[in-house]
């Protein structure tokens, strides 16, 4: 069987809030995780980002996207590389597994992120305004040193301590729609 855990997030919020939780699937197929890590090492990542109408050099994270069809980058327009799932076989196996486990056909696209210096870079607190369905597949030895941190916010201020969820090499993290943070810009509700 699988080693799965539901992490309840709502009890951490001191004010009334919608139910939120995350599913963590630990250690599925170490062989697939090893192959996925190996394949990500040879990717030519995009090192730019598009913010506030401008293309800038990305210092905190580098990325490429994955989907059924490939697409070349257009840096001057802020359009990132899309690699075909067929060229990311181990990642595609992981996607097929978690899609089947969740009984969903909605995991069509992915984003492969690389943090150039795991000890000095990361991203700040934010929600995901574009996606309600999000799955994270963590690979790499540094995973154990970098848990996922979640926090409840209201009116732009934190209303609880960070909720840390440790993830290891080959673990999946599946937040509920509320935990994804699609409403993160709505300041009045946690």
Q: Where on the chain are the PLM-derived regions?
A:
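Non-heme Fe(II) oxygenase metal-center motifs and adjacent flexible, charged/small-residue loops
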Residues: 1-190
């Amino acid at each position: 069987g699988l080693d799965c855990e539901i992490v309840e997030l709502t009890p951490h919020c001191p004010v009334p809030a919608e139910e939120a939780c995350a599913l963590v699937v630990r250690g599925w197929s170490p062989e697939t995780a090893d192959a996925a890590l190996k394949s990500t090492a040879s990717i030519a990542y995009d090192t730019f980002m598009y913010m506030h109408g401008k293309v800038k050099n990305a210092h905190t994270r580098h990325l490429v996207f994955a989907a059924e069809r490939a697409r070349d980058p257009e840096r001057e327009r802020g359009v990132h590389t899309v690699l075909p799932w067929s060229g990311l076989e181990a990642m595609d196996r992981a996607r097929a597994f978690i899609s089947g486990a969740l009984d969903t056909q909605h995991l069509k696209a992915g984003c492969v992120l690389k943090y150039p210096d795991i000890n000095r870079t990361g991203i700040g607190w934010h929600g995901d305004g574009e996606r309600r369905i999000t799955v994270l597949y963590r690979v790499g030895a540094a995973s154990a040193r970098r848990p996922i941190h979640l926090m409840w916010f209201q009116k732009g201020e934190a209303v609880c301590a960070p909720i840390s969820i440790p993830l290891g090499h080959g673990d999946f993290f599946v937040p509920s729609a509320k935990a994804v943070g699609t409403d993160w810009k709505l300041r009045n509700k946690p």
